[in-house]
Swiss-Prot record:
Subcellular location: Cytoplasm
InterPro entries, sorted: RecX_HTH_1st (IPR053926), RecX_HTH_2nd (IPR053924), RecX_HTH_3rd (IPR053925), Regulatory_RecX (IPR003783), WH-like_DNA-bd_sf (IPR036388)
Record protein name field: Regulatory protein RecX
Any Pfam family hit: RecX_HTH1
Function: Modulates RecA activity.
GO cellular component, one term: cytoplasm
Origin species: Haemophilus influenzae (strain ATCC 51907 / DSM 11121 / KW20 / Rd)
Alphabetical list of HAMAP family matching this protein: RecX
Amino acid sequence: MSSLAFNYIVNLLSRREYSEFELRNKMQEKNFSEEEIDDALSRCQAKNWQSDRRFSENYLNSRVQKGYGVGRIRQELRQLKGVSSDIIDEVLMESEIDWYEMAENLLRKKFPNYNEQQTPKMKQKIWQYMLSHGFRSDEFADLIGQNQSEWD
């Protein structure tokens, strides 16, 4: 057991939460062996210093504050942070976020005059912005008086 590997993880975790995937990548960059990585991670997880579930909850809250929807958050957690789909599903199910209300608030903030600007170009801009922020069309299309079929 390498105390150097363990100390490295503890040092990282003392600053912020990390997913297991992120910690593994950081330790591999520092050329720790797989055995050292596994051992250090196991010790931290046993002490509840590292938890993908807790990381996902914190990440969800931070991304919601920045105006991102469920699709974008799910994708980032899975692809960029390496969190398992099961954990992501649990965290999203347990969250009490009203994605429709969030989409409406973001739409009002980013496009304050969206009701008055009903040009096709403006609708296209809103549509692209909302989709790129991870909102499903059913969460915002009726807010701009539009059906998805109008864009097909």
